[in-house]
C-alpha cells in the first residue's frame, strides 16, 4: 500500500510547498525444502568435493516494510529553505526446522529448531538552505543531515538435537548447546557542509571565488547478549517429542532451593 500527497501555494511573497509519502509492504515466503550444504576439498588430485554437512528442511520468512517521508520547503526572493525527514524500517521473522547430516569428523544426524527476529531501520533528517546576498553576488548554501541506523536481532533461538534411533537427544559435545542470542547495533552519523560562491569581475571577465567546509561525524555501538542452556540429567518428554519449549518449563528449571 502506498499513499503520496503534495502541494505548493503562495503565502504573500513566499512560496510554500510540502510532500508526504507513506508506504507499507508485507511479504511471506515458504521454502519447503531449503538446503544449505558444506563441502571440503581433500586433495589436489581429487576433483570431487567431500560432504561435510548436508542441511535441509522447511524455512518460512515473514517480512514487513513500512516507510514514511515528509518534506516542506519555503522560498523567498533571497532565500530557500527545505526540511525533510525519512524513515525506512524492515522487520523479519524466520522459523525453520532443519535436518542436518554431519558426514565428516563426528558423524551424526541432527534436528535443529531455529527462530529468528530481526529489525532494521534508517532515519534521516535533511535541513537545507540557500541564500543570495549582496544583490546576488554572494551565494551561501548549507546542509545539515543527521542519520540514525539500527540493526537489532531481537531474538535468536537455536535448539539442536541429535537424532538417535528415531528419538531426540541433547548432546552438546556433538550438536552444541541450545542458545538464545540478542544483538544490537546502533549507528549515529552527522554530515554538515557549507559552500560560499562569490561572483565578481576580473579584467572585464566574469569570475567566481568558491570556498566551503565539511564536517562528518560517526558513532557506533554494538553489543551481544548470549546465554546457553545447560542440562543436568534428562528432561521428561524430550526424547520422544524433540520439543524445545520443554527447555524452560518451570518444572525443568533448576532451583537453588531444591
Task: Please tell me what each predicted stretch does.
Residues 11, 16-22, 52, 64, ...:
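Extended aliphatic helical segments
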Residues 33-44, 88-90, 97-109, 156-166, ...:
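Flexible, surface-exposed loop regions and adjacent strand-edge segments
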Residues 57-59, 108, 112-116, 181-185:
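Outer-membrane beta-barrel domain signature
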Residues 91-96, 105, 109, 113-122, ...:
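Generic N-terminal amphipathic/basic segments
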Amino acid at each position: 500500500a502506498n499513499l503520496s500527497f503534495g502541494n505548493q501555494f503562495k503565502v504573500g511573497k513566499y512560496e510554500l510547498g510540502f510532500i508526504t509519502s507513506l508506504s507499507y509492504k508485507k511479504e511471506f515466503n515458504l521454502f519447503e525444502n531449503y538446503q544449505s550444504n558444506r563441502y571440503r576439498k581433500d586433495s589436489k588430485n581429487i576433483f570431487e568435493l567431500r560432504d561435510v554437512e548436508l542441511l535441509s528442511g522447511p524455512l518460512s520468512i515473514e517480512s514487513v516494510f513500512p516507510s514514511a517521508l515528509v518534506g516542506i520547503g519555503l522560498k523567498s526572493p533571497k532565500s530557500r529553505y527545505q526540511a525533510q525527514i525519512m524513515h525506512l524500517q524492515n522487520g523479519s521473522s524466520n522459523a525453520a526446522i532443519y535436518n542436518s547430516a554431519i558426514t565428516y569428523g563426528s558423524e551424526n544426524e541432527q534436528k535443529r529448531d531455529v527462530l529468528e527476529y530481526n529489525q532494521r531501520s534508517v532515519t534521516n533528517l535533511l535541513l537545507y538552505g540557500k541564500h543570495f546576498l549582496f544583490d546576488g553576488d554572494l551565494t551561501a548554501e548549507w546542509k545539515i543531515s543527521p542519520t540514525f541506523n539500527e540493526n537489532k536481532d531481537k531474538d535468536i533461538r537455536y535448539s539442536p538435537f541429535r537424532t538417535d534411533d528415531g528419538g531426540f537427544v541433547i548432546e552438546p559435545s556433538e550438536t552444541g548447546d541450545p542458545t538464545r542470542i540478542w544483538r544490537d547495533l546502533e549507528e549515529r552519523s552527522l554530515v554538515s557542509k557549507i559552500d560560499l560562491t562569490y561572483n565578481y569581475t576580473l579584467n572585464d571577465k566574469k569570475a567566481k571565488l568558491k570556498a566551503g567546509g565539511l564536517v562528518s561525524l560517526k558513532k557506533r555501538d554494538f553489543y551481544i547478549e548470549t546465554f546457553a542452556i545447560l542440562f543436568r540429567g534428562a528432561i521428561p518428554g524430550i526424547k520422544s517429542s524433540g520439543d524445545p519449549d520443554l527447555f524452560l518449563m518451570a518444572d525443568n528449571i533448576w532451583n537453588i532451593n531444591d
